[in-house]
Amino acid sequence: MEAQKLSAQEIIQFIGNAEKKTRVKVTLSGMPSFKAAGFLAENGRPNFKALANKGIQVLGDFHTHYSLKIIIGDWQAVRPLLSGLTENKDYTLELEGRNSAVPLLDTREINARIEPGAIIRDQVTIGDSAVIMMGAIINIGAEIGEGTMIDMGAILGGRATVGKNSHIGAGAVLAGVIEPASAEPVRVGDNVLVGANAVVIEGVQVGSGSVVAAGAIVTQDVPENVVVAGVPARIIKEIDEKTQQKTALEDALRNL
């Protein structure tokens, strides 16, 4: 799925100008303070239209006092509804961040496999048949090519780019660059394998067909079709048939 590609400066402006939100989910037994919060209609019932206009979502039976109810919205809008109620007695509250500027990506229409627990921020591009494993963290502006797997706990920083049919191993880090705006992001080519817990430093480009060994720290550009390893990473050999066999991807893992 193609997201709008943003430059570093555009991302900075997007975050800086975004309305900061502290989203909460309240589960309560009892009746919210609709009157005190100014959400009571003339007929004495909750004004659901006014609630919606404030970005507050309400679920449950609000005509029965002791039925279970759920309120979702920004803390500043929801807070007045809880006046007179006691936390952990009348209600419980779940907090999602504080003054967050970037929402999570809506993945409903993305033609990829995204496992529970992956954290993907808005303005991320994910190609068809890509795989995002649990615990992966993908920051704003990142791009993931078709058929690429981002393994468990891997981190793609802001604007990091990975080509097609690549594999970013568990715990690996592709360092992100949003500030300074002049810096270049990490770019990983097609058919690349980055081993577990490897780190690719800001601005580094990894050429197509190459392998970054587990635990390597890559501080310089990597040409195509080589294996790099060590701290800092150095070229240890060119890709040969044996290496290709060891690093081959499994198409079945990308079936949807």
Swiss-Prot record:
Biological pathway: Amino-acid biosynthesis; L-lysine biosynthesis via DAP pathway; LL-2,6-diaminopimelate from (S)-tetrahydrodipicolinate (acetylase route): step 1/3
PROSITE patterns: HEXAPEP_TRANSFERASES
Record protein name field: 2,3,4,5-tetrahydropyridine-2,6-dicarboxylate N-acetyltransferase
EC number: 2.3.1.89
Phylogenetic placement of the source organism: Bacteria, Bacillati, Bacillota, Bacilli, Lactobacillales
Gene Ontology molecular function: tetrahydrodipicolinate N-acetyltransferase activity
Alphabetic keyword roster: Acyltransferase, Amino-acid biosynthesis, Diaminopimelate biosynthesis, Lysine biosynthesis, Repeat, Transferase
BP-aspect Gene Ontology terms: diaminopimelate biosynthetic process; lysine biosynthetic process via diaminopimelate
Native source species: Lactococcus lactis subsp. lactis (strain IL1403)
Function: Catalyzes the transfer of an acetyl group from acetyl-CoA to tetrahydrodipicolinate.
Any coiled-coil regions, as ranges: none
Catalysed conversion reaction: (S)-2,3,4,5-tetrahydrodipicolinate + acetyl-CoA + H2O = L-2-acetamido-6-oxoheptanedioate + CoA
Keyword Manganese in record: no
Superkingdom to which the source organism belongs: Bacteria
